[in-house]
A protein has these predicted regions:
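Short pre-catalytic strand/loop immediately N-terminal to key active-site residues, enriched for Gly-Thr
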Residues: 41-47, 247-262
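Phosphate-handling active-site elements
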Residues: 63-67, 237-248, 274-288
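Short, well-structured alpha-helical segments that form the helix of a local strand-helix-strand
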Residues: 198-206, 248-250, 280-297
Length: 323
């Protein structure tokens, strides 16, 4: 279902859903690679359900060539996090440069940044990469930010400086993929308790920040699990009417399963892998949502861990055989 919210009067009646919210003369049509080259910038999960391990599986599931840069080494399993080691921004930048100096990256998915210094390092790298691509007359990569800021328990994972650094990263992203608690932190609000409130918060944030938002409704209860793509109207934010955005809602049945570990990582990674292969963010988001719903249904068959298990990223290409 598509909802057309009030739009700025100078906006055409049907703005494209894949509108890039930042001017970028460097991006343009060109020969597509045989496989999109997609980079994950995130933390680790040694059990494979979340972080860069999950991202690489999601990239593979959508026909992309996956690469990974590690922001933090996380000792975790299906029951929770035990310890985190952050190598630091200098080594993070060395990893990022090692990739971009050699490989033309088509899309970047950013997940856990761990701290303010790392977030700033990623932002500076994105700026330098965009400048280098523009100087070469080449398009910059699509950027998807999964703002990992709140634990499942509701605990804030970042201090105030790091939260602001993530907000600054959001200004460099094409799409931000918050759940309800993360959206509240981004916007400085209380977490929404209804879908209507969440849509209002997402629309307010999108129009004020000029960010495209893929809002995830998995934290709500009910028979359905909606997501929504919120695209702000074109034009400067100072002249934009409040709520001037287009909202496209993707409904799906709520899968009754405890195997939800890494769902946010996996959805944002699928979105990053799909965007270079699809005509719009709406098309990519719809396909990513459908894939994740199937991955949730299939997760129990994996039998990985004794806690909150992972989804099955390969449920389409290599389904688990019964017996």
């Amino acid at each position: 279902m598509t909802l057309a919210l009030p739009r700025h009067t100078s906006d055409p009646a049907s703005a494209p859903a894949d509108r890039d919210h930042r001017p970028d003369p460097g991006r343009g049509p060109g020969p597509a690679p045989s496989r999109p080259r997609v980079l994950s910038v995130a933390g680790t999960d040694p059990t494979g359900g979340a972080g860069i391990q999950a991202d690489l599986k999601a990239f593979c599931a959508h026909g992309a060539y996956g690469m990974a840069v590690t922001t933090a080494l996380v000792a975790q399993n299906t029951h929770g996090v035990r310890s985190v080691h952050v190598p630091g921004p200098a080594f993070l930048r060395a990893q990022l440069d090692a990739v971009s100096d050699d490989v033309e990256v088509d899309a970047v998915k950013i997940g856990m940044v761990a701290d303010e210094a790392n977030a700033r390092a990623v932002g500076e790298w994105l700026d330098d990469l965009a400048a280098a691509r523009a100087a070469a007359g080449a398009p910059r990569p699509w950027v998807v930010l999964d703002p990992v800021m709140v634990a499942t328990s509701g605990h804030r994972l970042l201090d105030a400086g790091a939260e602001q650094a993530v907000r600054d990263l959001a200004a460099r992203a094409d799409v931000v993929t918050p759940n309800l608690p993360e959206l509240a932190v981004l916007g400085g609000l209380e977490s929404a308790t209804t879908w209507d409130d969440a849509l209002r918060q997402a629309t307010s944030y999108a129009t004020a920040s000029d960010a495209v938002v893929l809002l995830k409704g998995g934290h709500l209860t009910g028979r359905t699990s909606p997501d929504a793509l919120v695209v702000p109207a074109p034009g400067p934010t100072t002249g934009r009417a409040p709520g001037a955005a287009t909202v496209t809602t993707f409904d799906a049945e709520r899968v009754d399963t405890p195997h939800t570990h890494g769902t946010g990582c996996s959805l944002s990674a699928a979105l990053a892998a799909l965007r270079p292969q699809r005509a719009s963010w709406e098309e990519a988001a719809r396909e990513a949502k459908e894939w994740l719903t199937g991955a949730l249904r299939a997760g129990a068959a994996l039998r990985v861990g004794t806690g909150r298990g992972p989804v099955d990223h390969l449920h389409r290409s290599a389904p688990v055989r019964p017996g």
